[in-house]
């Protein structure tokens, strides 16, 4: 959204800062509470919630109710995964670029970011004995992204969502 509204550099800067928002919470939690895997796993959940429901983007609706604005949390979700295990961030980023290019829907790409982290950390828990808390993070992040992207999902199901990437040229 930032890239569409203000150009490539603003969009890139915004994406980097949003990724660092998620990763930074994990790094801080790991530093201060290295043995509390559940607290570490929930740190980026709160970053996603703060991103999606920012007090800095608060508005009143027509009935006067306060509505907190924000994004979907995809970049913050990627950052959370990056904070747990940096190779996961690279794996997810590469797969997300491929999904975006070949599937062509930004919302599907955003949802896949958290879903991929669930699979990666479930695999690490099974194979390497990692804490299951990180896989649970992926499930919660996926749920938050699905909730935030409800309008996009409705457009997808109706066939009205914007197409990007390779499929747009077909």
Model-assigned labels for residue ranges:
Residues 9-10, 79, 134-137:
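Short alpha-helical transmembrane interface motifs in multi-pass membrane proteins
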Residues 23, 93, 143-147:
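Alpha-helical transmembrane segments
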């Amino acid at each position: 959204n930032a890239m569409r509204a203000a150009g490539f550099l603003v969009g890139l800067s915004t994406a980097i800062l949003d990724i660092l928002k998620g990763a930074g919470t994990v790094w801080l939690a790991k530093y201060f509470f290295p043995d509390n895997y559940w607290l570490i796993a929930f740190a980026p959940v709160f970053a996603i919630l703060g991103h999606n429901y920012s007090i800095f983007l608060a508005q009143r609706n027509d009935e006067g109710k306060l509505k907190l604005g924000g994004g979907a949390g995809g970049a913050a979700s990627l950052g959370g995964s990056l904070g747990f295990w940096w190779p996961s961030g690279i794996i997810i980023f590469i797969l997300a670029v491929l999904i975006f290019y070949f599937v062509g829907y930004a919302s599907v790409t955003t949802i896949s970011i958290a879903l991929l982290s669930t699979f990666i950390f479930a695999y690490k828990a099974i194979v390497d004995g990692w804490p299951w808390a990180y896989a649970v993070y992926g499930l919660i992040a996926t749920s938050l992204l699905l909730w935030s992207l409800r309008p996009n999902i409705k457009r997808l199901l109706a066939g009205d969502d914007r197409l990007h990437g390779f499929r747009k040229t077909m």
